[in-house]
Amino acid sequence: MYIPQKQLETLTKILQPSKVIVVYGPRRCGKTTLLNEFLKGVNLRYLLVSGEDIVVQNYLSSQSIEKLLSFVGANQLLVIDEAQKINNIGMNLKLIVDHMKDVKIIATGSSSFDLAKNLGEPL
């Protein structure tokens, strides 16, 4: 799948610590491909996970700050594909951002309604 360079440049430009970038769109439109292509050029320690993975759901739906921080570890970038599958994802991403000021986060979702509902308040 072709990924326009402009999309990669935009992601690079807006990726900042203490912010969450949400990439959403219909299934099979290229969100995961965009992320994989983006990650090829990133010079950060990153963790790429899927919200469909039950272990990931267990960690990222937890409201334990200690559990969330241990999951992210020393990574500088957390990338969550299918984030809408994780309960309380919005509140928990906010906890990560509030307690790990240097971490950058990208979340994707195929259902903007479900993702928006689970994100709750703007981050």
Give each language-model segment a name.
Residues 1-123:
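Phosphate-binding site recognition
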